[in-house]
Swiss-Prot record:
SUPFAM superfamilies: FabD/lysophospholipase-like. Belongs to the patatin family. This is Patatin-01. Residues 361-385 form a coiled coil. It comes from Solanum tuberosum. Its main location: other. The nitrogen atoms of the two glycine residues in the GGXR motif define the oxyanion hole, and stabilize the oxyanion that forms during the nucleophilic attack by the catalytic serine during substrate cleavage. GO terms for molecular function: monoacylglycerol lipase activity; nutrient reservoir activity; phospholipase activity. Residues 1-23 form the signal peptide. Glycans are attached at N115. The active site is at S77 (nucleophile), D216 (proton acceptor).
Length: 387
């Protein structure tokens, strides 16, 4: 009798624990963030291809797409372009690009995007005409409200001196943000000195003309948009009726995948205090952006890692980043075939590397674990919706 009673108690405990785990997973808000970095977008493109492939295997569905699994997908610069590629609908209302089409996109169009150098010292390095052409061709007349999941794409308005964040959740209050995706993608990629700023106009809720004068989203969020994506997810959880059960969102209820485009350790070894003490404005101008982006990326990752660890939810956050780029792979605009091949190899090799010195788990293993959480959560929500 005692044995039977003990068995019943154990069974109830296991059931309660399992139910609690499933309920917790079902309530998770899932966020994907993709850094900027020009042609180095090949690196996160490789990671996204691996992740989507794992999801397709787990769910036995060759048509599974990343937009089916993430509540918010955010990006800046080339990360904004990737965001649009995997969330913009085609004629069948499915993402127009599968993840395995991202790297081929860079190989096909990268050399043309970064090949129209104006050769002017006082002007942008590239005219941006081919970039706009291919964006219009691929994205058509699609606007923000048509994205297949919530998006968060940043830019910076040089006339108002304010960041501009394009998201679906802002449209009710600010319909002027319902811009065409190709305008948004060009704007978030219009890095000063590389491409000309972008002007376009939409209409306000009163029908008045609303003008944008935009440059690269990295000016607003630097290169790592993870905190921006988290902020958009938090707002959605507070305002969207579909997320009523998790209005009090905290990091324990979030799954965050942040993809970098690589940094270099060579840069840190190149310059010393003794050398830079002799620098003038021009020399600092050439490297200050790289310094700022690297520092911001490290600090964003440090902050998020600390928060998730303090909440004992470190497995809810995964930052995938290569920190030892060398040679031509450090350049955002080297679209030579040889360099693009190197970048693709960097992405492949990254999967085999440990997540950190303190975590021997490889990125491949971590992404498989992350994919399992995404897959299980999607199934739980689908089952709930069927009742």
């Amino acid at each position: 009798m005692a044995t039977t009673k003990s068995f019943l108690i154990l069974s109830v405990m296991i059931l309660a624990t399992t139910s609690s785990t499933f309920a917790s997973l079902e309530e998770m808000v899932t966020v994907l963030s993709i850094d900027g970095g020009g042609i180095k977008g090949i690196i996160p493109g490789t990671i996204l291809e691996f992740l989507e492939g794992q999801l397709q295997k787990m769910d036995n569905n060759a048509d599974a797409r990343l937009a089916d699994y993430f509540d918010v997908i955010g990006g800046t610069s080339t990360g904004g372009l990737l965001t649009a590629m995997i969330t913009t609908p085609n004629e069948n209302n499915r993402p127009f690009a599968a993840a395995n089409e991202i790297v081929p996109f860079y190989f096909e169009h990268g050399p043309h995007i970064f090949n129209s150098s104006t050769g002017q010292f006082f002007g942008p390095k590239y005219d941006g005409k081919y970039l706009m052409q291919v964006l219009q061709e691929k994205l058509g007349e699609t606007r923000v409200h048509q994205a297949l999941t919530e998006v968060a794409i940043s830019s910076f308005d040089i006339k108002t001196n304010k960041p501009v964040i394009f998201t679906k959740s802002n449209l009710a209050k600010s319909p002027e943000l319902d811009a065409k995706m190709y305008d948004i993608c060009y704007s978030t990629a219009a890095a000063p000195t590389y491409f000309p700023p972008h002007y376009f106009a939409t209409n306000t809720i009163n029908g008045d003309k609303y003008e944008f004068n935009l440059v690269d989203g990295a000016v607003a969020t630097v290169a790592d948009p993870a905190l921006l994506s988290v902020s958009v997810a938090t707002r959605r959880a507070q305002e969207d009726p579909a997320f009523a059960s998790i209005r009090s969102l905290n990091y324990k209820k979030m799954l965050l995948l942040s993809l970098g485009t690589g940094t270099t350790s060579e840069f840190d070894k190149t310059h010393t205090a003794e050398e830079t003490a002799k620098w003038g404005a021009l020399q600092w101008m050439l490297v200050i952006q790289q310094m700022t982006e690297a520092a911001s990326s490290y600090m964003t990752d440090y902050y998020l890692s600390t928060v998730f660890q303090d909440l004992h939810s470190q497995n809810n956050y995964l930052r995938v980043q290569e920190n030892a780029l060398t040679g031509t792979t450090t350049k955002a605009d080297d679209a030579s075939e040889a360099n693009m091949e190197l970048l693709a190899q960097v992405g492949e090799n990254l999967l085999k590397k440990p997540v950190s010195k303190d975590n021997p788990e490889t990125y491949e293993e971590a992404l498989k674990r992350f994919a399992k959480l995404l897959s299980d959560r999607k199934k739980l929500r689908a089952n709930k919706a069927s009742y």
